[in-house]
Amino acid sequence: MAAVATSFCFSPHRSPSRFGNPNSSIRRTIVCKSSPRDESPAVSTSSQRPEKQQNPLTSQNKPDHDHKPDPGIGKIGMEIMSIALPAALALAADPITSLVDTAFVGHIGSAELAAVGVSVSVFNLVSKLFNVPLLNVTTSFVAEEQAIAAKDDNDSIETSKKVLPSVSTSLVLAAGVGIAEAIALSLGSDFLMDVMAIPFDSPMRIPAEQFLRLRAYGAPPIVVALAAQGAFRGFKDTTTPLYAVVAGNVLNAVLDPILIFVLGFGISGAAAATVISEYLIAFILLWKLNENVVLLSPQIKVGRANQYLKSGGLLIGRTVALLVPFTLATSLAAQNGPTQMAGHQIVLEIWLAVSLLTDALAIAAQSLLATTYSQGEYKQAREVLFGVLQVGLATGTGLAAVLFITFEPFSSLFTTDSEVLKIALSGTLFVAGSQPVNALAFVLDGLYYGVSDFGFAAYSMVIVGFISSLFMLVAAPTFGLAGIWTGLFLFMALRLVAGAWRLGTRTGPWKMLWSAPEKPE
């Protein structure tokens, strides 16, 4: 697959301009197509211009200049679901694979199972802190850059591959972050076990360190794959990542019994199976991305990388603020004893698992809003905003109804202890009743990212996390789990209030969306 190192040929009379998003520092680079041996700009006339062939990855992003307001949300709703459903399936694939891994490792022994649990917790914490911010920033930046490229396609020569510096920048940063994570996790495994308070004489200690050191080799492909997923999301394509994730997870499920039991590698085999599957996922995503985009563009600039780091830094701070209330809730629940903690864990796991569906709506909101906003199609952007909020509210309400009916039988799958089950069922109102609020809060996250409103997303999360954590510290000693669950509901409700306030005040990047006239066609 030979790379075609040609980009778009814009009018030489145009000056470089910012993307339609005034909050983004990404600038459009004007590069005229030229012969490899001739550095002079190519001259394109209507008679010379070859017939354009639609690119299946990007043709859907071209603006519809004949766009007319949809009287309902039918068309937008269908587009939202076409993005959200594959994304939800991809998000659900990893937890399902974790259950498969747990089942296989559990047949080795309880100490090994506990060791893997500790190691996976450490690995996932690092992943959430550094990898998820890169994923979200990549999605927004690629969507913006691709939207501008699609907007100017009428003034350009269509090439077989797109040159999008945001894709190249994210992949290079991902490789660097992945290597750094691998080194830190491998060399720091002993220190990290100390942080997790695993004593040296614990039967978990040695297998936990061994598993973490092997899993560290999978850090680079994980980060690179997430960056590639962000690029595909920027193209509004969540189906390709789904195929890649499913292929990798199927391979993992096949390799687990072979490496663990047949070859006798134990938990080392479980780690190796996971790492191999992660490299397969990264390979598939890069292979498919390379068919349409130049992966390593010579146009990578320091300023662009700095913008990634700045926005990513804000989202790392936001992730920390997000983790604090949940960590505190677990700590406070554990102080009530093992039975209370077990009931709380069932409630929390179901609550978080259901959130995958609404988190997929946030992905759709981010991709669609970033595209329309960057193109200056503000009327269409407003339709996307209202449409995704309506779909989010409908989804949350539907999930609430389903959970009210099914929470009891679903909870019984996790335990046969009547006392634990009784405690879990006392959280039905919290799990089911909070779903509409959760759905809207997650959708608002996607809307923030769609207009690169990373600063407000980060700072508001710090304030919301502080208030809800303080509430739990005061309420938990008196009201027990009810106080903890109320604090978590408050956390989500305040996120919704903050988002509604941001939209209502029409400040920051939202000012342009509400006040700017529609671009002339």
Curated annotation (Swiss-Prot):
CDD domains: MATE_DinF_like
UniProt keyword annotation of Transport present: yes
InterPro entries named among the record's database cross-references: DinF-like, MATE_fam
Main location class: plastid
TM region positions: 80-100, 103-123, 167-187, 213-235, 242-262, 268-288, 314-334, 345-365, 385-405, 423-443, 454-474, 481-503
Transit peptide: 1-31
Phenotype upon gene inactivation: No reduction in aluminum tolerance.
Alphabetized Pfam families for the sequence: MatE
Family assignment from sequence similarity: Belongs to the multi antimicrobial extrusion (MATE) (TC 2.A.66.1) family.
Name used for this protein in its record: Protein DETOXIFICATION 44, chloroplastic
Organism whose genome encodes this protein: Arabidopsis thaliana
